[in-house]
């Protein structure tokens, strides 16, 4: 059995409130109901190989 995915934090495009969503949740701000959410930037190092 796979471990449960961690909830991801999103920022509302209207009011700026942070929202934590899990898979299957409605993509909507919990404060104002706005439907455009932006994913927060990850803290881990992301490195790609250039060719």
Swiss-Prot record:
Recorded GO CC terms: RNA polymerase II, core complex; RNA polymerase IV complex
Stored InterPro entries: RNAP_P/RPABC4, RPABC4, RPABC4/Spt4
Main location: nucleus
Pfam families noted in UniProt: Zn_ribbon_RPAB4 (PF03604)
Binding-site positions, Zn(2+): 12, 15, 29, 32
Keywords for this protein: DNA-directed RNA polymerase, Metal-binding, Nucleus, Transcription, Zinc
Compartment annotation: Nucleus
Single GO MF descriptor: DNA binding
Protein's GO biological process: DNA-templated transcription
Family assignment from sequence similarity: Belongs to the archaeal Rpo12/eukaryotic RPC10 RNA polymerase subunit family.
Role according to the record: DNA-dependent RNA polymerase catalyzes the transcription of DNA into RNA using the four ribonucleoside triphosphates as substrates. Component of RNA polymerase II which synthesizes mRNA precursors and many functional non-coding RNAs. Pol II is the central component of the basal RNA polymerase II transcription machinery. It is composed of mobile elements that move relative to each other.
Subunit structure: Component of the RNA polymerase II, IV and V complexes. Associates with the mediator complex. Interacts with NRPD1.
Name by which UniProt lists this protein: DNA-directed RNA polymerases II, IV and V subunit 12
